[in-house]
Amino acid sequence: MESAVDRHVFYISDGTAITAEVLGHAVMSQFPVAISSVTLPFVENISRARAVKEQIDAICQQTGIRPLVFYSIVIPEIRDIILQSEGFCQDIVQALVAPLQQELNLDPTPVAHRTHGLNPGNLIKYDARIAAIDYTLAHDDGISLRNLDQAQVILLGVSRCGKTPTSLYLAMQYGIRAANYPFIADDMDNLVLPASLKPLQHKMFGLTINPERLAAIREERRENSRYASLRQCRMEVTEVEALYRKNKIPCLNSTNYSVEEIATKIMDIMGLNRRMY
């Protein structure tokens, strides 16, 4: 049974709402509260702002509890309309800007879409991120072994241990060119590093996973198959972990970590530079 919703939460912005959503979610994660959230980006005109206000007010009337509103809005007229709503409104950016304004002795120059928008100042970084995503997609799951020397990290692991989502997160969030290579059941009789990968051992990072968790994930994909059996999963994990130890490849058990946590740990262990976009 799903837990009851304790509070309704709105993440609102005149831009992408990514900042409001990420910071608001980080704040809400500190409280043992079940939430139902709505993200409303590009609230850029009066009519849309009024519609959002009505949506907030309707929830308040239905539940008798003020919705929580995390907003990042540059346009004063839009911000004023949201503040007139029945929600508990928090400007998550201004809470940081005000003390910084004092410390820097500078007035802020707020511009909508500056954080995640495309502008002349970040075109080079944007192009680099797109190139990283293209590279990562082209080198997913061992599709291509060409130009592997251009990878910043090469993830290794058995099927369904988290290589693809982690690679894509590294590319999309940080502009990291991440290749990944799978070890499949047919490899297990004589598991060795492919000759094409050996010269790039310094770029390799291994992922592993608890066999029980791996079996559960595989069962959803191929029910009642040898591929998903606990015995097969145990054998594959054992062989791959032995390979990591033999070749001194750094590794991480992904079982209890989110994609974000896995990616961050990989970057830290491999000494990869963060690039924020």
From Swiss-Prot:
Record Pfam families: Kinase-PPPase
Intrachain S-S bonds: none
Catalytic reaction(s) noted: [pyruvate, water dikinase] + ADP = [pyruvate, water dikinase]-phosphate + AMP + H(+); [pyruvate, water dikinase]-phosphate + phosphate + H(+) = [pyruvate, water dikinase] + diphosphate
Keywords: Kinase, Nucleotide-binding, Serine/threonine-protein kinase, Transferase
InterPro entries listed in its UniProt record: Kinase-pyrophosphorylase, PSRP
Domain of life the protein comes from: Bacteria
Enzyme Commission no: 2.7.11.33, 2.7.4.28
Molecular function in Gene Ontology: ADP binding; ATP binding; phosphotransferase activity, phosphate group as acceptor; protein serine/threonine kinase activity
Binding of ADP, residues: 157-164
Assigned protein family: Belongs to the pyruvate, phosphate/water dikinase regulatory protein family. PSRP subfamily.
Family annotation (HAMAP family): PSRP
Protein's job: Bifunctional serine/threonine kinase and phosphorylase involved in the regulation of the phosphoenolpyruvate synthase (PEPS) by catalyzing its phosphorylation/dephosphorylation.
Protein name: Putative phosphoenolpyruvate synthase regulatory protein
Organism, as annotated: Klebsiella pneumoniae subsp. pneumoniae (strain ATCC 700721 / MGH 78578)
